[in-house]
UniProtKB/Swiss-Prot annotation:
Disulfide bonds: none annotated. Single strand-specific metallo-endoribonuclease involved in late-stage 70S ribosome quality control and in maturation of the 3' terminus of the 16S rRNA. It comes from Nitrosospira multiformis (strain ATCC 25196 / NCIMB 11849 / C 71). Belongs to the endoribonuclease YbeY family. This is Endoribonuclease YbeY. Residues 1-23 are annotated as: Disordered. Transmembrane segments: none annotated. GO terms for cellular component: cytoplasm.
Length: 189
């Protein structure tokens, strides 16, 4: 088996030299009372690093449906809980409610990723997906949004989907879009 020298999130420079791995400062918060298993901090970190192409400071929060609904309503004007939300902070602007608080370091990417446990669990069941595989997919999806990926246009959606699929395969997970379109598999806007 070929040794993996870097994550698939790392841009390919075309050179043989091993790319320098992205530095990550990450805070994880569990704010849900779900009875289903939640990904460990180590798994979340592994998934984030696999998708990361730049040094980053990220707060990842797993929430209940009430908080997920409130955040989606307040920040996106969508009156329902969604599976993943990504908040990117530029030019040192951090939302006052961010788990990062005022402790922003010298990282070029700073942001929050919020996963709504009940929505993730429900989707995994409806789509007959392994729960941890679905958490991995949505974590990677959020990290790609943090780095500027989006899926508003068809070509952008295709690029994001291919990148997610490649990263998840590298992590040992199946194609999350097999049998689905992006809008069906990931409902983040």
């Amino acid at each position: 088996m070929k040794e993996r020298s870097s994550s698939p999130g790392t841009p390919d420079s075309g050179r043989r030299a091993r790319p320098k791995p992205a530095k990550l400062k990450m805070t994880v918060q569990y704010a849900t009372s779900t009875r289903e298993p939640l990904p460990s901090r180590a798994l979340l970190r592994k998934w984030v690093k696999a998708a990361l192409a730049h040094d980053a400071e990220i707060a990842l929060r797993i929430v209940d449906e009430e908080e997920g609904h409130r955040l989606n309503r307040d920040f996106r004007n969508k009156d329902y809980a969604t599976n993943v939300l990504t908040f990117v902070y530029r030019d040192g602007q951090i939302h006052p409610d961010s788990p990062l608080g005022e402790k922003r370091g010298a990282y070029p990417l700073t942001g929050d990723i919020v996963l709504c446990a009940p929505v993730v669990e429900n989707e995994a069941g409806q789509q007959q997906k392994d729960l941890m595989a679905h958490y991995a997919h949505l974590t990677v999806h959020g990290v790609l949004h943090l780095q500027g990926y989006d899926h508003q246009e068809d070509e952008d959606a295709k690029n994001m989907e291919e990148t997610e699929t490649r990263i998840l395969a590298w992590l040992g997970y199946e194609d999350p879009y097999a049998g689905y379109q992006l809008a069906e598999a990931v409902d983040c806007g």
